[in-house]
Amino acid sequence: MNLHRKTLVLLHGHGIDDTIWDSLDAAINDTHTVVRPNISLFTSCQTVEEYADELHRFLTNANIQKCTLIGHSMGGYISLAFAEKYMDMLEGFGLFHSTAYADDDAKKHQRGQMIELLRTYGTESFVKSTAANLFGDRYKELYPERIKEHIAHFGKLPAEALIAGITAMRNRPDRTAVLASLPFPVLFIIGMQDKLIPFESVIELAEFPKKSYPLIFAEAGHMGMVERPDATARMINWYMSKI
């Protein structure tokens, strides 16, 4: 590993795997050492804290002592749990279509329904039912074939791993205090058409850290790395230059 290059860890969200970052590779790999853990197959973790411990083991085994950690959606929940326990390993932090708030009762109920859907019908039906809410309207209109490819690719993930992830998300605590305690600027990537993480709630979170850098996509949903890869890569590169 080149010691002069900063290490950037990109942690994917639920219902996808690390290939979701593929469209960013060319734009960020030349500048940083990019690490993309794949947590999509984990079945033994039942809490975000357990996922964070697995991430710590992975990074330690890779001899990574310092890194910038950017988590997408569920990856953000895990990243906050990681920051709470392993702050000394971090030199930068980002929430990518994610939040530090806990689930409210309605969201917890919805997650219970998702678990039942997975148990009854399996992964492909689950991915089909959730894919429409992942992307902004413009992307869905312009690229319907890519939505089909998304379903075909991620519809093969093991249902047991998806259920474990949903259980962990449902039971996670509020970590706004962790967000406020971060000693470095925090990157927020936000989609105004995000149906899963509402814009209004995330923009409020930007007030918690001592310094925040929000990137707002007017026409993106929950998948900015796919919907707006060039702008995402530019913002990540810019953020990495500031820490």
Where does each model-flagged region fall?
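Conserved alpha/beta-hydrolase catalytic His-Asp/Glu region
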Residues: 102-109, 121-181
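Conserved alpha/beta-hydrolase "nucleophile elbow" surrounding the catalytic nucleophile
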Residues: 12-14, 67, 71-73, 191
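Conserved hydrolase catalytic core segment
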Residues: 66-104
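Short beta-strand/loop motif that positions the catalytic acidic residue
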Residues: 182, 188-190, 194
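Catalytic histidine neighborhood in serine/cysteine hydrolases
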Residues: 199, 203-222
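Conserved HGGG/HGGXW glycine-rich cap/lid loop of the alpha/beta-hydrolase fold
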Residues: 2-48, 58
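Conserved acidic catalytic loop of the alpha/beta-hydrolase fold
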Residues: 50-67
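Catalytic histidine-centered segment of alpha/beta-hydrolase-like enzymes
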Residues: 220-233
